[in-house]
UniProtKB/Swiss-Prot annotation:
Belongs to the TDRD5 family. The keyword Repeat applies. Residues 232-306, 739-763, 803-822, 864-891 are annotated as: Disordered. Gene3D superfamilies: 2.30.30.140, 2.40.50.90, LOTUS domain-like (3.30.420.610). The keyword Transferase does not apply. One of its GO terms (cellular component) is chromatoid body. Residues 6-79, 122-197, 375-449 form the HTH OST-type domain. This is Tudor domain-containing protein 5. PROSITE patterns: HTH_OST, TUDOR. One of its GO terms (biological process) is P granule organization.
Length: 963
């Protein structure tokens, strides 16, 4: 009742979806529309179906299935009386060109998890190896259709993915293999049964049967008694302890076929022979004691004849093989007695001949069991005849042409499920031999040397018959026989008895998924602009000079989190996790994989750094920068879709600081880790040195901005480097595992590093010195809003206009109010100050204001009580002369005077004196960066934490209005 209710609901929903579509829907579009309308997938499992096509085939009163010329399936609704009016309205709708193009595009690239192979009118063919696997699986026992995939996976270790071969459903697969598989309907469901034995086996059994039936009625009495006693008579061990009891078990294929195909004839002939067996003398046979019980058990069940004969060292003189028995049974009695009379000495090479024949028979059976078993006997004989016509061998590339010239037909290797002629020839190892040409560019085909096998077989029969005919002879052989042993011969590497596909798969032992990442490198993040402020998380700290940072933003940290969530959802599936297991022969240094440590729920991208032993290896986390030792069994192949996000960890270093000793102390490293733990910091990019990012770090979560490098110096854990410490940065050892970003690196500024004294003096010689005078009145400090540590401290989508913040391409000269201020500024300029940036850059904003993430709210101008008076023309001329005199003094003073600059420009605010305390023994932490001027006419707005960093570095100050 429940299934009927679900079926009625599904039929109603499917009908409504198909009626609403004028041009019909494909199967994928129907599944997508059903999921969008209902909110869940089509309940196939609840209704007992494996695919949507099977469900639609059982709804002929709802769905019409149309097959297009390109092989695609189009679905339309069956209109009834209740829905006829709606269908008429839908058919009257006007088609839109955009809708048609959209539908056509969907048909070309359907949105489905499996990209099915698009085929035309040619029906797909199941590969011969897969067909052989199905025949092998069903030969054990019949299987239900619902249990086929599970049984296939448990036996062969891989899933039965029929969609890879062009099939849309299991129904099409069963139709293509109807020659070997039969479907029977039972109460439990569809039962897959292997069809009866093939024509080759049947013909072999018939030949054996005819050889028995063609004998005269009076002849087989004596010969048949011998054959019957060999099968069913209890064995009596011979009292000769000096002879070893080494035995060999032989199962001739001919007799096995005979016993399995004609059990009734065996039983009837056995009963007839057994009635006359008492008239014959007892035949002594030496067998092992362990095998005598099996012969007795076989005697109790006459319907199942014995398939095995046990031979020992006395086999040459006291036993008889099946081949000799069949040969003797086809002879008259006179010939058999003549063979007994013509007894000869036993030969020690008989056992070697039996071993070789057994080995050849096993190889032939294995070749028949593989993909070559699907080739018919007629095709085998034709191929063999074509190859035998060329005594010097036939090139495998010329086989299709020679076959067509002989038979008038094309070589049907594709119809049999073989991908190439080489694969077909590889499956026919029982009739063909392959040899490489002298050049090694092609293969030559030779027919199997059956003549030699027949001669060897007949010679072995003659020697065996002559030795076995002396059963009742009293002569003893003085020559000792060698015990039977196992001979291991070196097999030629070019010889392959099975199909070529199995030879390729045997080297890897596991199927590597097609979307697994192999021999690829992860991309780095694109380089960040000089003087750009970013939010960072500090990861994997070794010292203040060696650590990793991870950028925060929608394109960096958020994408990484989304990718890790997808990896967790994907690899948590047991089937997916088992399929992507990395074998030991696929693990190599520098390759990227997926990893999950037991006890952790997240999957990470890792790169193998070194292999310690057979179980442990060192891996590098490209997204976090740390190195860990893990087990090989924890690795999984990384899917190719997880390579889009670049490596997030950026090797970094603090500039202009070094350790107080030869190496960084443990206390300094511990303190630096405490400052960086669990806090998003604001970083100001200085430059790149050997792929290492030199960056300033500032903690803006407290009331005052804290520069980490200055704090370490103040606490005595580090010292200021007088030279450029960034030049001494060592190259990161893990960067060769990554490849540069495909995006073009952002343009570096013209002043990517701290300007030297010589460069500053050159700039001062070519540019006019521009003095910026700041009002003596203490400027109003802007309100610095607090922000929580768990939120972003910037907005990447904020766009500013070029004119925001009073940016101007021409330098502005503030007017001088009084002579007192002018003298004061002139006095400060004469004081030497090192590492001062160019005064021309101080008044010019070369970069857009949005790089500093500062938002300024425009407001109406407020009238200032103390307006700056306009200077006269004489004052401007006096200012220009004073500027020219200042420049001349700097040129005469050399390197010390070339660094003169407005000290008040950097130390304007008297409240923030943290950096000023270190100015005697160091320089400004943000030397070389641009300064921003905020016009006094604008009311101060709520500046973000990034603006606070600029304010603490004296890059943001109030400028006087110029009228």
């Amino acid at each position: 009742m429940e299934q009927e209710r679900i079926m009625q609901r599904v039929q109603k929903d499917v009908r409504s979806l198909l009626i609403a579509s004028k041009n019909g829907l494909s199967i994928q579009e129907l599944e997508q529309d059903y999921r969008m309308m209902i909110g869940s997938q089509i309940p196939l499992r609840s209704l007992g179906y494996k695919s949507t096509m099977e469900l639609l085939l059982d709804m002929p009163n709802v769905v019409q299935i149309h097959t297009q010329m390109d092989g695609t399936v189009n679905l339309s609704a069956v209109v009834d009386e209740a829905t006829r009016k709606i269908a008429d309205l839908v058919s009257c709708q006007k088609d839109r060109s955009t809708a048609r193009s959209r539908n056509r595009r969907r048909n070309i690239r359907p949105r489905c998890p499996v990209d099915l192979v698009r085929r035309g009118r040619v029906s797909p063919v199941l590969p011969a190896t897969v067909k052989s696997d199905l025949r092998d699986l069903l030969s054990l026992s019949p299987l239900l259709l619902s249990e086929l995939e599970k049984a296939f996976f448990s036996r062969f270790g891989r899933s039965f993915q029929y969609t890879r071969y062009g099939f849309y459903s299991m129904l099409e697969v069963l139709r293509s293999i109807s020659d070997i598989v039969e479907v029977k309907q039972t109460r439990t469901g569809s039962l897959l049964v292997l069809r009866k034995s093939e024509t080759g086996h049947i013909s072999a059994s018939l030949c054996v049967k005819k050889s028995l039936d063609c004998q005269p009625a009076a002849v087989p009495n004596k010969t048949s008694c011998v054959f019957e006693k060999c099968l069913n008579e209890p064995q009596r061990p011979e009292k000769k302890p000096s002879e070893p009891a080494t035995s060999l078990k032989i199962s001739p294929p001919e007799f096995q076929k005979f016993s399995s195909q004609e059990p009734q004839s065996i039983t009837s002939s056995r009963s007839f022979l057994h009635s006359s067996s008492n008239k014959e003398p007892d035949v002594n046979r030496n067998v092992s004691l362990g095998e005598s019980k099996k012969s007795i058990e076989n005697k109790t069940s006459p319907a199942v004849p014995s398939n095995n004969v046990v031979l020992n060292n006395s086999l040459v003189k006291n036993s008889e093989t099946f081949e000799s028995l069949f040969t003797r049974m086809s002879k008259p009695v006179s010939h058999v007695e003549a063979d007994h009379a013509n007894a000869s000495e036993p030969n020690s090479s008989d056992l070697n001949w039996l071993e070789k024949k057994l080995e050849k028979e096993l190889k032939l059976c294995l070749a028949r069991k593989g993909a070559g078993g699907s080739v018919s006997d007629d095709l085998r004989s034709d191929i063999k005849h074509v190859v035998n016509q060329h005594s010097n061998g036939l090139n495998i590339s010329l086989l299709p042409t020679a076959f067509k010239s002989f038979t008038g037909k094309d070589l049907p290797f594709k119809e049999l499920g073989f991908m190439s002629v080489m694969e077909l020839v590889g499956s026919l190892g029982d009739i063909l031999c392959l040899e490489s040409t002298d050049e090694g560019k092609d293969w030559k085909l030779f027919g199997a040397k059956k003549e030699d096998l027949v001669d060897e077989f007949s010679a072995g029969l003659r020697s065996t018959n002559s030795s076995l005919s002396s059963w009742n002879s009293t002569r003893q052989s003085t020559a000792p026989l060698k015990p039977v042993g196992t001979i291991f011969s070196k097999v030629d590497e070019k010889l392959w008895w099975g199909p070529l596909e199995l030879k390729v798969c045997s080297t890897e032992q596991i199927d590597i998924p097609p979307d697994a990442v192999r021999n690829q490198k992860l991309h780095c993040l694109p380089r960040i602009k000089h003087s750009l402020m970013i939010g960072v998380y500090v990861e994997s700290i070794e010292s203040p000079s060696q650590f990793y940072v991870r950028c925060c933003g929608k394109d960096t940290s958020e994408k990484l989190e989304d990718m890790m969530i997808e990896m967790r959802h994907c690899y948590s599936n047991e089937c997916v996790s088992e399929r992507y297991i990395v074998p030991d022969n696929c693990i190599s240094v520098g390759q990227i994989y997926a990893l999950r440590v037991p006890g952790d729920v997240w999957w990470y991208r890792v790169i193998v750094h070194s292999i310690k032993n057979s179980e442990l290896l060192d891996v590098f986390y490209p997204d976090f920068g740390n190195v860990a030792t893990v087990k090989k069994s924890w690795l999984r192949f990384l899917k190719n879709c997880y390579m889009k996000v670049p490596a997030q960890a950026v090797p970094s270093s603090l500039p202009f600081v070094t350790s107080t000793e030869a190496q960084w102390s443990t206390q300094a490293i511990k303190r630096f880790r405490q400052l960086c733990s669990c806090l998003p910091l604001v970083g100001l990019v200085l430059q790149y040195v050997q792929d290492v990012l030199v960056i300033f770090l500032c903690d803006t979560s407290s009331a005052e901005d804290v520069y980490l490098h200055q704090l370490l110096i103040a606490q005595g854990l580090a010292k200021m480097e007088p030279e450029h410490a960034c030049k001494k940065v060592s190259r990161n050892t893990f960067m060769h595992y990554l490849t540069p970003s495909q995006e073009k690196p952002q343009e570096e500024s013209s002043k990517s590093s701290v300007p030297s004294e010589s460069s500053q003096s050159e700039v001062l010689c070519t540019k006019e010195t521009i003095l910026q005078v700041i009002d003596e009145v203490d400027p109003e400090m802007p309100y610095l809003e607090a922000f929580p540590t768990d939120t972003d401290v910037w907005d990447e989508n904020w766009v500013f206009s070029d004119g925001a913040g009073g940016s101007n391409t021409t330098p502005t000269i503030p007017k001088v109010e009084t002579q007192k201020q002018e003298n004061k500024i002139s006095k400060e300029q004469k004081q030497p100050f090192k590492f001062c940036m160019d005064s021309g850059d101080a008044s010019v904003v070369h970069r857009p204001l949005e790089e500093f993430y500062i938002s300024l709210i425009k407001s109406s101008k407020s009238q200032e009580s103390t307006d700056i008076q306009q200077s006269s023309h004489t004052e401007e001329q006096h200012l220009a002369e004073k500027s020219h005199r200042c420049t001349a003094e700097q040129l005469q003073g050399g390197s010390s005077s070339s660094m003169l600059c407005e000290k008040k420009l950097y130390y304007e605010n008297k409240d923030l004196t943290y950096c000023q305390q270190q100015s005697k023994c160091s320089f400004s932490p943000l030397i070389g960066f641009q300064k921003l001027q905020i016009p006094r006419s604008a009311t101060p707005a709520a500046l973000g934490p990034a603006a606070r960093l600029a304010t603490a570095g004296r890059l943001l100050y109030w400028a006087s209005d110029s009228h």
